[in-house]
């Protein structure tokens, strides 16, 4: 097992990793930018190192500073969290070259699954279902037109290196294909420094379903069931829950086993997520793989009672998984609301500031993952996440009621600070959400309905 882990991240995930390290008897090193000097993880970790000014490109994304901090403190491993450098194969390789174990997949594996066209090809060969489309980059506008005619409109053009909802365009008519093909390539080059794109059939209003898995270096892989992440706005998730109420036990087992086989077939090690689209006929189609822990991992932990961060650390240290597939049981229903410093009444505009009041909720089966405290200033340089509020209950209706109760207790205020709590409570009261009739267009229609009522 590792002796010391440097945490190349900030906010709630950095604190989450530091806590896992302490429970495993591992010393932790927090990295912090200038404005994060008083952050909760800096106070909690065994050591802390300043890595640069507030701009992430000069601190959390500045590889020489991050590696320098790891070497300076004698850390033998590095946990990247999510975001920042967590899916950068170049960074993972630099860690390895400096004798630091990157807690995640090997660089060459990360590169394979990070290229969405290559990942589609590999997962198709491993037996995962795919939407009709290409498994190789589309080289010309003429080729794009041929593909559109072959699979039928609408289609979606995606950057092979894309992520976070960027680098994609939906094409509904043949006459728009050439223009949107060139637009997507230009965006991909500007944002991801890679102009390659692929094309697949576009599903209107599918459900977003993802499988959580962990694989070790001994050929073992375990899936921790699925999450439904359909409540999202502009491809940014707002509410996640587990399990999906739209999968049968047979589907759940089948897609979980296929996801693990797919991951093992490419030599994957560590925690990862297979993302799928679920159509209204119950068909699942592989979309992409995320080679890291995800923001919403707590809901999977709540329904399985397995600490996924600790599993990540164990397998990176060369240990086998601490659980087998037979050990992992699905119990009850969990839900997570992302409490962000945003104003839902102003198109989710940033609403950061100093927290004068911060009182998280309590009660049975109620969990708050947060780095915030009274007096903490939410910096405008990073994401707007204040806290992840997670609840568990025996059934989904009970989980909804528990979440609403917990949200009603959550006290957050400060000059200029607004949160998404009122939005979440309105969603929880919506009959469509309560019935589970939710797809990726839910928030768009929900907000339009609210606007119509005001008008």
Language-model segments: what does each one mean?
Residues 1, 164-165:
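An N-terminal boundary/leader segment
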Residues 1-125, 138-146:
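ATP-binding N-terminal substructure of ATP-dependent carboxylate-amine bond-forming enzymes
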Residues 6-28, 48, 71-73, 89-91, ...:
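ATP-dependent carboxylate activation and anion-phosphoryl transfer catalytic cores
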Residues 57-58, 110, 167, 297-299:
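A generic structural signal for short coil/turn motifs at secondary-structure boundaries
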Residues 133-134:
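Conserved beta3 strand of the protein kinase N-lobe
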Residues 146-156:
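Acidic/histidine-enriched active-site and ligand-binding environments that engage anionic O-linkages
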């Amino acid at each position: 097992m590792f002796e010391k882990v440097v945490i190349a991240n900030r906010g709630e995930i950095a604190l989450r990793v530091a806590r896992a390290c302490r429970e495993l008897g591992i010393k932790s090193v927090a990295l912090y930018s200038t404005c994060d000097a008083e952050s909760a993880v800096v106070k909690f970790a065994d050591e802390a190192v300043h890595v640069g000014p507030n701009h992430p490109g000069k601190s959390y994304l500045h590889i020489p500073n991050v590696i320098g901090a790891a070497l300076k403190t004698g850390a033998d491993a590095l946990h990247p969290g999510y975001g920042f450098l967590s899916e950068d194969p170049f960074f993972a390789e630099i860690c390895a070259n400096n004798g630091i174990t990157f807690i995640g997949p090997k660089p060459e594996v990360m590169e394979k699954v990070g290229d969405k066209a290559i990942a589609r090809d590999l997962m198709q060969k491993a037996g995962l279902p795919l939407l009709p489309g290409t498994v190789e980059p589309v080289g010309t506008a003429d080729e794009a037109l041929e593909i559109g005619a072959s699979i039928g409109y609408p289609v979606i053009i995606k950057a092979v290196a894309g992520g976070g909802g960027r680098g994609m365009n939906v094409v509904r008519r043949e006459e728009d294909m050439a223009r949107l093909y060139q637009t997507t390539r230009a965006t991909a080059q500007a944002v991801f420094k890679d102009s390659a794109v692929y094309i697949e059939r576009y599903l209107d209003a599918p459900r977003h379903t993802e499988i959580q898995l962990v694989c070790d270096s001994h050929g073992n892989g375990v899936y921790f069931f699925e999450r439904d992440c359909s409540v999202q706005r502009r491809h940014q998730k707002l509410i996640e829950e587990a399990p999906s109420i739209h999968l049968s036990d047979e589907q759940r087992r089948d897609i979980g086993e296929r996801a693990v086989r797919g991951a093992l077939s490419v030599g994957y090690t560590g925690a990862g997520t297979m993302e799928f689209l679920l159509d209204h006929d119950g068909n699942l189609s592989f979309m992409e793989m995320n080679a890291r822990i995800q923001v919403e991992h707590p809901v999977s932990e709540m329904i399985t009672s397995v600490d996924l961060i600790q599993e990540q650390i164990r397998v990176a240290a060369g240990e086998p998984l601490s659980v087998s597939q037979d050990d992992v049981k699905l119990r009850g229903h969990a839900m997570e609301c992302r409490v962000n410093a945003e104003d839902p009444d102003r198109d989710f505009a940033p609403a950061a500031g100093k927290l004068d009041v911060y009182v998280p909720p309590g009660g049975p089966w109620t969990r708050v993952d947060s780095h915030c405290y009274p007096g903490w200033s939410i910096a405008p340089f990073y994401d707007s996440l204040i806290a992840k509020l997670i609840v568990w209950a025996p059934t989904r209706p009970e989980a909804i009621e528990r979440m609403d109760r917990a949200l009603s207790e959550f006290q957050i205020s400060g000059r200029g600070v607004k949160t998404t709590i009122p939005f979440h409570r309105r969603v929880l009261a919506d009959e469509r959400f309560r019935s589970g009739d939710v797809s990726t267009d839910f928030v768009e229609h929900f907000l339009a309905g609210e606007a119509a009522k005001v008008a």
